[in-house]
């Protein structure tokens, strides 16, 4: 682990009796792309504002490179923020907007010109310095807002839902550009979004939030494949979440049947929830089925069919298949043991991580495909 650049220790934020953040612990390393992901009102922007110095923490410590900065004013912190509305000045040219912070610092004109030109080159708008803000597209304005932030040479760049105002095609393009920019700059990005696709596509690490708490942190693959609870599983991508019961290590029951799984360390007969991603289900004939479902409806999504079905116990199923099915037909489903993920009710992240460590690697031996 490299030297942390930002640390939050037991940070709480309250307004009267309303708790916005509850005992937030968070560590950001230098040179990585992090995302705070959660629904509106979960506290993710408050974390951003607390790090930036725009909002004071009620309790807890905020550290920058190991030093407490709770009392350091926003303009003295080596972080910059890109806001959702970009906050560009319409009466200034592009270059004047980018130079604004340097001008306030009374930097020499030659230095300002050099750094502005460098920042515009980094966001691929080198020839736009003399243009008016009103002449720019939404994507160009967003890049100018980023240039205005990085021209200050921050060690941390905070981005508060900067892609939310863009159309779907441009938003996807900007995901590539932001990730590429972060890697070229080599600084820490902390990105705020409610869009799961953005978080999964760009991040080195994701913090999933709800109701003022960080529920789970980890790589996009870890968060997607090993959600800690119902909220995370449902919020990150599409899921089939079913009630079940743990039979033994690597054995779980749901849907009226018992199946081999990749989870262990859970007491026998404990009620659990099982997650199966729609893309991990395969349609098959009834003779080879692990479960039988009745097709309700389907939608063609371009590269796959999204099929809604119901099993004999009334559980709803969502299946992604390259092959179509007929409405009303009974059809079989099959899946691999490692495609089942078992979730315990009320399990905290530390408990979840400790349980996984006790049997980590054993499931790979059990399900090694040779």
Curated annotation (Swiss-Prot):
One GO term describing the cellular component: ATP-binding cassette (ABC) transporter complex
SMART domains in the record: AAA
Enzymatic reactions: ATP + H2O + polyamine-[polyamine-binding protein]Side 1 = ADP + phosphate + polyamineSide 2 + [polyamine-binding protein]Side 1
Top-level taxon of the source organism: Bacteria
Pfam families: ABC_tran, TOBE_2
MF (Gene Ontology): ABC-type putrescine transporter activity; ATP binding; ATP hydrolysis activity
Keyword Transport annotated: yes
Assembly notes: The complex is composed of two ATP-binding proteins (PotA), two transmembrane proteins (PotB and PotC) and a solute-binding protein (PotD).
Function field: Part of the ABC transporter complex PotABCD involved in spermidine/putrescine import. Responsible for energy coupling to the transport system.
Family: Belongs to the ABC transporter superfamily. Spermidine/putrescine importer (TC 3.A.1.11.1) family.
The protein's name in its UniProt record: Spermidine/putrescine import ATP-binding protein PotA
Taxonomic source organism: Levilactobacillus brevis (strain ATCC 367 / BCRC 12310 / CIP 105137 / JCM 1170 / LMG 11437 / NCIMB 947 / NCTC 947) (Lactobacillus brevis)
